[in-house]
Amino acid sequence: MEWCLLRTPRLMLVLVLWACGLTAPARAEEAARKFYAEDIKAAMMAHIAARADADGVFHLRDEKTGEELALKFVTIHDPVRVIDRNTYFACTDFAVVGAPEKLYDLDFWMNPQTGELKIYDEKIHKEPRKSLLYGWYKHPRYTFVKDRVVELY
């Protein structure tokens, strides 16, 4: 009986260490996974496809004006970026449905979740404005200082 009591804490310790050892490689593998430009772009395309309606229209509410925007994806800007080991970034252009000369520049932030990149934030970086001299251009709402958003107005 004494022998069993002495062995029980050791047995429990061994079982706990064994159980931790089974899950540790999975956590380490996820933390160690590196994502590259093609991974960031693939995550972006999957997000856009999931958010777009049957006609490929990406709907977004403008948080400054309250306007419901109907946009068509145009391109992902190069380069996409790794901000830190858990934050990835892509900048895109979307055209207003029915007015392809009016472009919105949308920014997307993503992080790794369950082994893949998922978008956790999106913002309108630049909005279409018209100049008598230059026509339509993208007017910035914010800029970046050391990878942080700084509002311009």
Q: How would you describe each model-predicted region?
A:
Residues 81-84, 95-107:
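Short, cysteine-centered beta-strand-loop-beta hairpins and adjacent loop/turn segments enriched
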Residues 100-125:
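A short, surface-exposed beta-strand/turn
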Residues 1-8:
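N-terminal secretory signal peptides that target proteins for export/translocation
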Residues 23-28:
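Sec/Tat signal peptide C-region and signal peptidase I cleavage site
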Residues 9-22:
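Bacterial N-terminal signal peptides
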Residues 29-85:
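N-terminal secretory signal peptides
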Residues 30, 116-153:
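C-terminal partner/receptor-binding element of secreted or periplasmic proteins
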Residues 85-91:
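Short, hydrophobic/aromatic-rich segments at coil-to-beta transitions
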